[in-house]
Curated annotation (Swiss-Prot):
<comment type="similarity">
    <text>Belongs to the PMP-22/EMP/MP20 family. CACNG subfamily.</text>
</comment>
<dbReference type="GO" id="GO:0051968">
    <property type="term" value="P:positive regulation of synaptic transmission, glutamatergic"/>
</dbReference>
<feature type="modified residue" description="Phosphoserine">
    <location>
        <position position="259"/>
    </location>
</feature>
<feature type="topological domain" description="Extracellular">
    <location>
        <begin position="31"/>
        <end position="107"/>
    </location>
</feature>
<dbReference type="Pfam" id="PF00822">
    <property type="entry name" value="PMP22_Claudin"/>
</dbReference>
<keyword id="KW-0851">Voltage-gated channel</keyword>
<dbReference type="GO" id="GO:0005246">
    <property type="term" value="F:calcium channel regulator activity"/>
</dbReference>
<feature type="transmembrane region" description="Helical">
    <location>
        <begin position="10"/>
        <end position="30"/>
    </location>
</feature>
<keyword id="KW-0107">Calcium channel</keyword>
<feature type="glycosylation site" description="N-linked (GlcNAc...) asparagine">
    <location>
        <position position="45"/>
    </location>
</feature>
<feature type="region of interest" description="Disordered">
    <location>
        <begin position="226"/>
        <end position="262"/>
    </location>
</feature>
<feature type="compositionally biased region" description="Low complexity">
    <location>
        <begin position="246"/>
        <end position="256"/>
    </location>
</feature>
<comment type="subunit">
    <text>Interacts with CACNA1C. Identified in a complex with the L-type calcium channel subunits CACNA1C, CACNA2D1 and either CACNB1 or CACNB2. Acts as an auxiliary subunit for AMPA-selective glutamate receptors (AMPARs). Interacts with GRIA1.</text>
</comment>
<dbReference type="GO" id="GO:0016247">
    <property type="term" value="F:channel regulator activity"/>
</dbReference>
<comment type="function">
    <text>Regulates the activity of L-type calcium channels that contain CACNA1C as pore-forming subunit. Regulates the trafficking and gating properties of AMPA-selective glutamate receptors (AMPARs), including GRIA1 and GRIA4. Promotes their targeting to the cell membrane and synapses and modulates their gating properties by slowing their rates of activation, deactivation and desensitization and by mediating their resensitization.</text>
</comment>
<dbReference type="InterPro" id="IPR008368">
    <property type="entry name" value="VDCC_gsu"/>
</dbReference>
<keyword id="KW-0472">Membrane</keyword>
């Protein structure tokens, strides 16, 4: 299921990268960013006898892009002219913000930069599909698409804020009216949305791959540590159990101080049982220095003397029985 979701995300990322680059390339290559009215299309149709055109007369309809303006009406219908962002009859202050906006608008640096970044991001997406084990390629693609979207939106804001969307020679009272944005402008805005979506998807794919790689590495490490030959050694097991049973050993230590008064031994004890008893008590001496107690050793010595006395008495009784028994 995870692989299916990742494959779908990768497919959407590839399709989105192609769509974002195509939309931006079409937007900067076409001349339909703005529809406006301009006098440039009918300015030469007037003679000296007719006089200048009326001040309130609207110009002919034009459509313009980032670099050209084309006439839809007038005697220059179907002709396109290069946009002059700095007319000679206007005196501009070179330190003003309007002049800087006109420079940025004339250069169109942000839309061009966005297109270049989209192209590089698309190449990284393609390389990421070929070299699927290298996650850094997908991360680089996501960063490039996010940067391309930011550059695109900055270019759109500059285009609107510069108030030069109408590149005609309109008068100051007509610049605020009679224009609307065309489909090339909306293609550029849609390219921004698609580019940011692709960038988020690419970063998400990188994060999921990185998480899966970490989980796989951790699982292999645990598997290798469990199959290590050191884990099968008795001393290694003893050290692992010793840390877990430290609290239990402290609770069980008082039971070793049992008094030999309560022990009742009937009859003689064979030598085999005596050796088993003595051997079974030997491991109890293997304790840490923290569990050492003088009372415990004294009790053990009393127990040992008690066993020897009973052994002698039992052996003496058995010899008497043998002597008094009739043959």
């Amino acid at each position: 299921m995870v692989r299916c979701d990742r494959g779908l995300q990768m497919l959407l990322t590839t399709a989105g990268a192609f769509a974002a680059f195509s939309l931006m390339a079409i937007a900067i290559g076409t001349d339909y960013w703005l529809y406006s009215s301009a006098h440039i299309c009918n300015g030469t149709n007037l003679t000296m006898d007719d006089g200048p055109p009326p001040r309130r007369a609207r110009g002919d309809l034009t459509h313009s892009g980032l670099w050209r303006v084309c006439c839809i009406e007038g005697i220059y219908k179907g002709h396109c002219f290069r946009i002059n962002h700095f007319p000679e009859d206007n005196d501009y202050d070179h330190d003003s913000s309007e002049y800087l906006l006109r420079i940025v608008r004339a250069s169109s640096v942000f839309p061009i930069l966005s297109t270049i970044l989209l192209l590089l991001g698309g190449l990284c997406i393609g390389a990421g599909r070929i070299y699927s084990r290298k996650n850094n390629i997908v991360l680089s693609a996501g960063i490039l698409f996010v940067a391309a979207g930011l550059s695109n939106i900055i270019g759109i804001i500059v285009y609107i804020s510069s108030n030069t969307g109408d590149p005609s020679d309109k008068r100051d009272e007509d610049k605020k009216n009679h224009y609307n944005y065309g489909w090339s402008f909306y293609f550029g805005a849609l390219s921004f949305i698609v580019a940011e979506t692709v960038g988020v998807l690419a970063v998400n794919i990188y994060i999921e791959k990185n998480k899966e790689l970490r989980f796989k590495t951790k699982r292999e490490f645990l598997k290798a540590s469990s199959s290590s030959p050191y884990s099968r050694m008795p001393s290694y097991r003893y050290r692992r159990r010793r840390s877990r049973s430290s609290s239990r050993s402290t609770e069980a230590s008082p039971s070793r101080d049992a008094s030999p008064v309560g022990l009742k031994i009937t009859g003689a004890i064979p030598m085999g049982e005596l050796s088993m008893y003595t051997l079974s008590r030997e491991p109890l001496k293997v304790t840490t220095a923290a569990s050492y107690s003088p009372d415990q050793d004294a009790g053990f010595l009393q127990m040992h003397d008690f066993f020897q006395q009973d052994l002698k008495e039992g052996f003496h009784v058995s010899m008497l029985n043998r002597r008094t028994t009739p043959v």
